[in-house]
C-alpha cells in the first residue's frame, strides 16, 4: 500500500518505509476533485506499465505541476479539477523538456 500525503511538501510513503517528497503544487489543490484527478493520473500511469512507486511519485509531481501552471496563468483560488486535467499535457511536456 502506498500512502500519499498532500501538503506544502507532498509525501509518497512506500510499503518498505521509504518516503519521497515533492514540493510542487499550491493551495488550489484543496479544490473538490483534485484528489480524484491524482488518483486517475496514477491509475493511468499504472495502466501504461509504470511501477507503483514511479506512478505515485510521477502522478503527484504532474498534478502539482499542473496546479502551478494554472496559478501562473490565472489564480490558484479559481483552480478546478477540470483545470488540472486540461493542463496535464502541458505539465508532462514541461517535465519531458527538462
For each feature predicted by the language model, list its residue ranges.
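Small-residue (G/A/S/T)-rich helix-start motifs and N-terminal tracts that mark the onset
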Residues: 1-98
Amino acid at each position: 500500500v502506498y500512502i500519499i500525503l498532500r501538503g506544502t511538501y507532498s509525501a509518497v510513503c512506500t510499503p518498505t518505509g521509504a518516503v519521497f517528497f515533492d514540493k510542487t503544487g499550491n493551495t488550489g489543490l484543496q479544490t473538490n476533485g483534485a484528489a480524484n484527478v491524482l488518483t486517475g493520473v496514477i491509475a493511468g500511469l499504472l495502466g501504461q506499465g509504470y511501477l507503483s512507486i514511479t506512478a505515485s511519485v510521477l502522478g503527484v509531481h504532474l498534478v502539482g505541476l499542473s496546479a502551478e501552471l494554472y496559478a501562473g496563468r490565472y489564480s490558484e483560488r479559481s483552480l478546478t479539477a477540470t483545470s488540472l486535467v486540461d493542463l496535464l499535457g502541458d505539465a508532462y511536456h514541461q517535465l519531458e523538456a527538462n
